[in-house]
Amino acid sequence: MGGYRTDDEYDYLFKLVLIGDSGVGKSNLLSRFTKNEFNLESKSTIGVEFATKTLNVDAKVVKAQIWDTAGQERYRAITSAYYRGAVGALLVYDVTRRATFENAARWLKELRDHTDPNIVVMLIGNKSDLRHLVAVPTEDGKSFAERESLYFMETSALEATNVENAFTEVLTQIYRIVSKRAVEAGDSGSSSGLPSKGQTINVKEDSSVLKRFGCCST
């Protein structure tokens, strides 16, 4: 679990959610990003867990609160609370298991049903280190991401490949949305300016400034 920071230690708090089938590596992506750890013996998450990490984005201190849940159907009852307030998501599939990729569309629909439809989403093909077992070509992931206006990266939590890049890209894009909103508010004569220090950001409140982003990959 990431360390808790008081309100005066960060400028923005962004809630991210990890979604995708059970066993695709969501928990290991989370632990790699927040603690730089990887557990080969990790078991499926039961219920909901979250961790935090604070980083600098364009000279602002951003605290990411990242939620992780099990992919099994028996945990569907937590859906609404899990998604509430999320401004970014990482949709994860396992590049060695075709079915997990085919289920990505269902996960994306559920996400958009419970959040602003323009939420910043990164499609992640995890376990890229298992090159000899790949069942989902990179081009398939790119095509789906382009079709749905998602970002896209292939990652390896085991080898720490692109893990930090994926989370950081999502957080940076959320921050840019918030910054654009603040600039537009200033241009219109609003006195609100930037959100107050430590404020939790809910992009849904200002969906008019959101744009669908094109696919990016490494």
Swiss-Prot record:
Signal peptide: none annotated. One of its GO terms (molecular function) is GTPase activity. SUPFAM superfamilies: P-loop containing nucleoside triphosphate hydrolases. It is a lipid-anchor. GTP binds at residues 20-27, 68-72, 126-129. A lipid is attached at residues 215-216 (S-geranylgeranyl cysteine). This is Ras-related protein Rab11D. SMART domains: RAB (SM00175), RAN (SM00176), RAS (SM00173), RHO (SM00174). A motif (Effector region) lies at residues 42-50. Belongs to the small GTPase superfamily. Rab family.
